[in-house]
Each structure stands twice: as structure tokens, then as C-alpha cells.
Amino acid sequence: MALWGGRFSQESSALFKLFNDSLPVDYRLVEEDIVGSIAWADAITGVGILSQQECQSLKQALQELLAEVKDQPETILASGAEDTHSFVEQALIAKVGDLGKKLHTGRSRNDQVATDLKLWCKKEGKALLELLAQLKAALLSLAERELDAVMPGYTHLQRAQPVAFGHWCLAYVEMFERDISRLQDCLQRLDTCPLGTGALAGTAYPMDRYALAKSLGFASPTLNSLDSVSDRDHVIELCSDAAISMMHLSRMAEDLIFFNSGEAGFIELDDQVTSGSSLMPQKKNPDALELIRGKTGRVYGSLMGILTTMKALPLAYNKDMQEDKEGLFDVMDSWSICLEMAALVLSGLKVNRENTLSAAQQGYANATELADYLVAKGMPFREAHHVVGEVVVEAIAQKKPIEEFELASLQVFASVIQEDVYQCLTIDSCLAKREALGGTSLTQVKAALAAKG
């Protein structure tokens, strides 16, 4: 039975019911709806709508229903109710009779769903903070495990300068720490309770909304009824936070997919996060990482979907806003599983140190060191840059690394070059000189690890 039938003389068409009903999506809010209803029972008791005995009867029935839906969630969808609010009210009436019809006094599904959704977002947001922390810990563990492994750093996907593998790990730690900060900010902003604002104009009953908000674990009540029931900023912000974090996950996945390729051979992924080919028996595919990269697109799509849905809605509530949940639920599910999977990938990852070191020694990654050496000898950097470019051209022609040139050959390009140049061209020297804060020297990487730990 619908909650709004008195105004209508005809039944809804079967097609409209299928089109209109939201239970197949919003059933995930049923626990929050019951918790909110328990708090509402106390609130309307405080203004004389319910007696203490009636309140206790309703709360007991709601607690029973909460246990039932946790134990047998399939009963929700089997009910045929229009939405999660209708399911709860119908189940309550089945338990306590006409008393159940009093619970909705002073309340609208508009403030009800806004409250349910915020409660759900708070719960899921806290779970995601834990997953982000676990991923950060996995990166720190990998950085410590492979602290002194050396690999080429890239710009334009070309070898640029040698870096410590731990430095690469710590770059993603920085990204995921920003994700944590953004999510914490979002959870702080959404921590206001809409319950008690009615359909749009506020409730007619003089209840203490501060006490109501506190009883549900919110920091405070919302302050404008029109905004309360039409606000979905928290949905947009969570989707945005997820999109940025998924971008970070996708970039990390792309790096690791390349590192894992036969062309690079820098790492080996554990069997438990890879799969094979139905035709080619030799294949070991990085499917976990590719799926992280692939799921990023659907998260972006959901963000654009809710932004587009909300962009032209007049105040206050509109049925369009029923479309806020499907995308949000998918975003949070996708973000969650990708964070878990990324941590699992990192936990079993092995670095092929010989390959990473060999790659770091190729591609003239020490060319910048030679330029810095010339600057130390008094040559202006722009001139030094040009001279080293000429050295690299000659090195490519001779198919040999810079450090294998004889001193006399190097002095053809710059007479200030002396025997001590060879000390500057080693991989160890390249790393050790990056001592400034945020650099890739082992001293800096160790300090960064200690600070993050």
C-alpha cells in the first residue's frame, strides 16, 4: 500500500509502479531508516504525539525489525513496497497495528531520506577512511621493503633521472593522504541532521532538533528547511572525492602495469592478483590493476551524472533526486573494492632490482649530473645544458654511456672537465645529491618514511 493514496481515484499503472519505485536501489538505506525512525519516535514523544508506552512499543518493534532485516535482508525486496520508507512503515504496522500509523506524524519522506542518506554516507565514509589508511600502510611497507632499490624516473614516459623505488611509493602516499584529508573534510561538512525539517517548510511540532541531531550522532541540525531537503552536495562531494582518489589509483595501476610488462620487467605481481589467457598458456595478466584502471571511468560517469541531475532543479525536493543513490552506491562500492585490491597487489609485489638498476643506468639518466658538475666548475647552467646535449649526441652515436668516455674525449666538449667527473656520474652519486627536502636520496627517503610512520 502506497503512503499517498488518498488523493487518487485510480491505481497506478504497473509500468508506472515499476518506473517509480525505488526499493530495488534504496533498500540499502533500510537500517538507517529504522535508526532514524527510532530517534523520531523519541522526538514526537517529547512534543506529546506519543505516550511513553506507545513510544516504547514502537521502538521495540523497530528494534525487532532492524534485527530481522540484518538477518534476512531478502525480505525487503520481496515486500513489493514502493521504497525503503514504505517498507519500514508497512512492517511496523504489521507488528503494532494502527499505532504504527502515528510514527510519520510531522515527518516527510523528504527529510527522512535526506537523513537516511547522510547517515549512510557517514558510515561508508568512515569505512573508506580505514581502507585509505590500509592502502597507505601497504605503500609504506613496500617502500621500506624495497628502500634501496633504484629505478629510472620518467617524464614523457622516457627515462629521465634515477630515483629510489621507495621514493616512487612515497609519491603515492602523498596522493592518498590528500584523499584522506578531502574525505575527512567532506564528512565534517555533511555532519548535519535534516530530520525535523519536513517536506520543505519545517515541522509543525516544536521539537528540539539539536537533541534529535545528537541522538543520531550528528554534530548539529541543519538550519534551513528548504536547503535541508534539497541538498545533495555531500553526494556530489563524495563522488568527487572518489573520482580524484580513483584517478590516483588508476595512475598507480598504470605505472605498475608498465613496470610489470615484458618491456620493463621491473616488478613481478603475485599469482593471486593476476590471471591467465584462455589461448596463450604463457600469459600472466595484471587484471587486478587493469580493472582498477577501468573502474575509474564509471566513477567519473557517476560524478557527471549527479552533477547533471542537480544542475537545474528548483527548490526544494524534486523526484529527479531519486536518481542520486544508484550512482553514489556504485561509486562507493567501486572505490572500496579498488582500495582493497590495490593494497593486496602491493602486499605481494616483488621488485626485480637487477632490471630496475640496469634500466636506471641506461638512457643517459646521469646527463643532468654532468650539467651540474659543469655548473660547479663555473659554467653557466644554460651553457652547461647545451654542452651536455652535445655529449649525449656523441654518446648515442658511439652507443656508449657517458661514464665510459675517456677524460680526453669529454674535455673536447669542455676543458674544465677533470678526473673527478667520474665520481659524479655514478647512480649512487645521482641519488645522493638529491638531499634537499622531498628529494630521492636515501637519506631523504628514510626521513620521509620515518615521518609517515
From Swiss-Prot:
Annotated protein name in UniProt: Argininosuccinate lyase
Entry-linked InterPro entries: Arg_succ_lyase_C, Argininosuccinate_lyase, Fumarase/histidase_N, Fumarate_lyase_CS, Fumarate_lyase_fam, Fumarate_lyase_N, L-Aspartase-like
EC number: 4.3.2.1
Primary location: cytoplasm
Location in or out of the cell: Cytoplasm
Family the UniProt entry places it in: Belongs to the lyase 1 family. Argininosuccinate lyase subfamily.
Pathway(s): Amino-acid biosynthesis; L-arginine biosynthesis; L-arginine from L-ornithine and carbamoyl phosphate: step 3/3
A molecular function (GO) term: argininosuccinate lyase activity
